[in-house]
Amino acid sequence: ILGLVAIAALVSCTKEDNGNDTTIQEGTFPKEVTYKNENGKVASKLVSLIEGGKILSSEIEIYNENGTPIRTQKDIITYEGNLIKKRETIGTGDDPNYNSFTETFSYDGTKLVKSVTDYKKIVKTITTTYSYDGDKLTNMVKTEPIQTIENGQRVEGTKYTETNFTYNGDRITVKEKTYTKKPSGLITDENTSFEIYTVVGGNVVKKEVTYSPSLKETIEYTYDTKNNPMVNNLTKIILPDYFIEKSRGRNNLLTTTITQVRNNQTFVTKRYYEYEYNNKDYPTSQKHFIEENGQKKPAGSIEFQ
């Protein structure tokens, strides 16, 4: 979770629709982001160092319910030109083994073609490759070591996650296949899932998932017309599948309606988001609510400074 928050913050808030410029424009990037829980207590705080239009480092601190820091993660960023070449992460807390790693990025022009994550305190490397058809992402393949059993012995195999993207107008079908390859080449633990996204005006407006014949889920989203600090030119490079993430649309999320059909019964959950904005139409705060018994109840907030 820490890594996802850090990389999201790292690539946020540069100016979009400015050619291929990936540098940060003044007034669009929050140097400090504070996350609070439903009771108004600080859950985490992210502070970034910016020089020359680039984030050189960021540090996130996680707090327990009593407001005591329990975990930190610091990122040191290295660039090649205006593209991120390396992210060195040092973590402390309950599991520093998994919070300390180095991630390197390789490009073809400005397209990300490979990322490699090397953990510092455990022997583990995760590699992800990306393929494109023109400007469209078509395939991602992630490989990582995994412990498995072969011939009665515990051995190291490789877990594969293959993600394919098919485009049809506003609809994007995402097929994800996971499996384990043993040292002998035997394939086991195969699983395939499908998700369908509808993207309009740079925002995901619907996500459809069929988990089983008796369980289906449809999620519908609405947005404001302001600038989303989580999407920009650098986002599109470093996170090539950004376009299926609701939090990385062109605008800011206003409502989420989750409709689940389980065994012919329908269940609906609604979430709401409210914002304050600066004079550049970027959010300075977000309040999150969830609807229960027809009433909106606080579910957390974010402050941008």
Short names for language-model regions:
Residues K15-Q305:
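Buried hydrophobic residues that stabilize the cores of well-folded domains
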Residues I1-L4:
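Sec-dependent signal peptide recognition
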Residues A9-S12:
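C-terminal motif of bacterial Sec signal peptides marking the signal peptidase cleavage site
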